[in-house]
Each structure stands twice: as C-alpha cells, then as structure tokens.
C-alpha cells in the first residue's frame, strides 16, 4: 500500500496473530444431539455466505458435550480446511458466537490484528492457500499446522482500519449488483480484486 513505511510493517505467522480453533460434528445417528438444538453449528458449505449471521443447523447441549465441537466468538474468521470443488481455502466473517464442523478452522484475532483485515488478507490468499494445502488436486486439505505457519503482513492498526474501510465499500458495491447483468457483475468483481491486491501489497 502506497505511503506505508517498511519500518511499520510486521511479518508474522497466523499462529502469532490469532488463536486457531478446530471444530467437530456430533454423531448424526443420535437424534438427541440434533433435534430442537439451539447451539449454532456451521458446516464448510456455508462459508460461501461470506458473513455469517445464522447457521443452517443447530445442535443440542448433549451433542456439544459429546463431540469436539467448540464455541468460537463473533468477529472471528473461519476458513474451510476441506470441501468439495472450490470450497477449500474460502473464508468468511462470523458475526455470532457459534460452533463448527471439523472441516472449518476458526481464527480468533489477537490485539495486533483487526478481524476484518485478517479476513480480507486471507481472501486475497485463496490461490496460495490452496497451493500449500496437503495432498493434491481437489483432494487436498489445509490443517492447523499449515495455518499456524502461514505468513501474514501486519501494518499498524490505523492502516488496517483504512484498508478495511475501503474494501468494505467495494464489497458493498459488488453485492449491490449481484442481481444485475453477468458482465457487469464480473467487471465489478475484477475491480474489487484489483484494488484489494493493491491495498494489501505492502513494502517487502
């Protein structure tokens, strides 16, 4: 990003700037783990929503207690570790406290980073994240250790806030025309990606 001094930029790993939490799935053959559940439970297929205000499924307290599902706080970022097609490597911002399945990892930001900045940075890293995934092709997968070691560039908090403010505006513009003509949507998406890359291109 133009105007940011190299001396103000920190290069960290995701494990240094966030707590990484994995999820789990209660036994689906036990109805008491699912029927009339009240605990939001997110699957990797929902990461396409980008912002998570609700989940498609809920689990009961018994299901939660008898699985490796873990509650994570709002204003965190989830990333798909695995999933069909293009799902692996996608990220979403969670706006409520929820639990997830084992195909998602939640990154809970520490004081050094704003969650929305972390989200946009990882969104820009989609192809690279898929490249470093274990395995090959569509059968590959991310894991906690890969994420902990994954590099991220951290500018000062005021710069993070500026980046988020600008990209939020572009994000709204893209979403506002989602019902428009395909060519217009494609053009706006390319503009968004171009400016996102420019904003997140800090001095090396």
Label each PLM-derived region with a short phrase.
Residues 43-44, 58-123:
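A short beta-sheet element
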Residues 9-14, 39, 72-79, 147, ...:
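Short, structured motif recognition centered on aromatic/hydrophobic residues
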Residues 96-100, 171-172, 181-197:
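Short amphipathic alpha-helical linker/capping segments at the junctions of internal repeats
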């Amino acid at each position: 990003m133009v105007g940011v001094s190299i001396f103000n930029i920190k290069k960290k790993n995701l494990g240094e700037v966030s707590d990484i939490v994995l999820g789990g799935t209660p036994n689906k053959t036990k109805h008491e783990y699912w029927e009339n559940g009240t605990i939001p439970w997110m699957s990797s297929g929902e990461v396409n929503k980008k912002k998570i205000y609700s989940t498609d499924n809920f689990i009961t307290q018994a299901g939660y207690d008898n699985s490796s599902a873990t509650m994570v706080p709002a204003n965190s970022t989830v990333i798909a570790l695995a999933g069909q097609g293009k799902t692996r490597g996608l990220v979403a911002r969670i706006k409520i406290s929820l639990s997830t399945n084992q195909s998602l990892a939640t990154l809970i930001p520490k004081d050094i980073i704003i969650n929305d900045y972390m989200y946009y940075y990882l969104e820009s890293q989609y192809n690279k994240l898929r490249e470093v995934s274990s395995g090959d092709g569509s059968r590959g997968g991310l894991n906690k250790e890969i994420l902990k070691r994954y590099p991220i560039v951290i500018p000062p908090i005021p710069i993070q806030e500026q980046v988020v403010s600008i990209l939020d505006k572009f994000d709204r513009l893209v979403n506002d025309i989602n019902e428009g003509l395909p060519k217009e949507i494609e053009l706006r998406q390319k503009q968004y990606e171009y400016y996102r890359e420019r904003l997140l291109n800090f001095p090396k």
